[in-house]
A protein has these predicted regions:
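Core of compact, soluble alpha-helical bundle domains
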Residues: 1-107, 111-160
Length: 160
């Protein structure tokens, strides 16, 4: 994605696979539901961490990520997913949402996409999801993430 104040042209949303992006947007709710199911099945303790309202928020998060991945697929540029992940990471930290749960949602989206996209279009979406996961992993290392800490290191650090 070009920066507008640098005088560079904006990204072309027809440079990638706009038809695939349209199919993703049309099936956004179904994809998000399946992605959340996969994330809940693959991530131990995720179902216990959230009540019904929290699960609805994670479902909405999956829908928003699918929209960003669709933009990446349409433009052929992963910057939309990277920028979104970078923008929302502090918000999740403030809400005590582990970024590992967001990574699980991204992997759930990846597992749900073959129902909508043919195998030739999956790599474009996979690149966008990999870019978002990379950003989430980078932010996960910062202090304040709600992930489970190493008990031994916490004992040594706090002095028990």
């Amino acid at each position: 994605m070009s920066h507008p104040s640098l005088g560079l042209p904006p990204s072309d949303l027809t440079a990638g696979l706009p038809a695939a992006a349209d199919r993703m947007r049309a099936a956004k709710e179904r994809l998000a539901g399946r992605a959340l199911e996969v994330a809940l099945a693959e991530t131990p303790g995720m179902r216990e961490r959230y009540d019904e309202a929290g699960l609805r928020r994670r479902l909405r998060d999956a829908e928003l990520m699918i929209e960003r991945v669709a933009l990446c697929v349409a433009s052929g540029d992963t910057q939309y997913a990277k920028g979104y992940a970078d923008m929302v990471s502090p918000l999740y930290r403030r809400r005590f949402v582990p970024l590992d749960d967001q990574i699980a949602l991204c992997n759930g989206i990846r597992a749900a996409l073959p129902g909508v996209l043919p195998p030739t279009e999956l790599p474009a979406a996979g690149e966008a999801l990999d870019a978002a996961i990379e950003v989430y992993r980078w932010h996960r290392r910062l202090a304040g993430d709600a992930r489970k800490k190493n008990a031994i290191l916490q004992f040594l650090y706090k002095g028990g």
